């Protein structure tokens, strides 16, 4: 398993941890978001817009942190995790 180097970003009171991952010609940034009890992973891809984050984003939360995940996002995360 590849060891990720996490970089910290701060957006107001929101702390974000980001790590770069490269695979199959694609580059993804993975941001681990922690805000109080809320925790999530944000997956950035190419050519997608998001109103909050400056790059394209696939966003989901960890089910144990907040139960708002849906199947599509969950499957996306499983697919990207295979590249790490």
List where the protein language model places each region.
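Short N-terminal "domain-start" leader segments
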Residues: 1-46
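Mixed-charge, Lys/Arg-enriched low-complexity segments
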Residues: 1-10, 41-84
């Amino acid at each position: 398993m590849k060891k990720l180097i996490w970089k910290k970003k701060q957006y107001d009171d929101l702390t974000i941890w980001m790590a770069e991952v490269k695979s199959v010609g694609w580059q993804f940034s993975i941001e681990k978001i922690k805000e109080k009890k809320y925790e999530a992973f944000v997956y950035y891809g190419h050519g997608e817009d998001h109103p909050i984050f400056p790059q394209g984003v696939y966003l989901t939360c960890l089910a144990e942190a907040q139960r708002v995940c849906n199947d599509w996002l969950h499957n996306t995360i499983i697919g990207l995790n295979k590249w790490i």
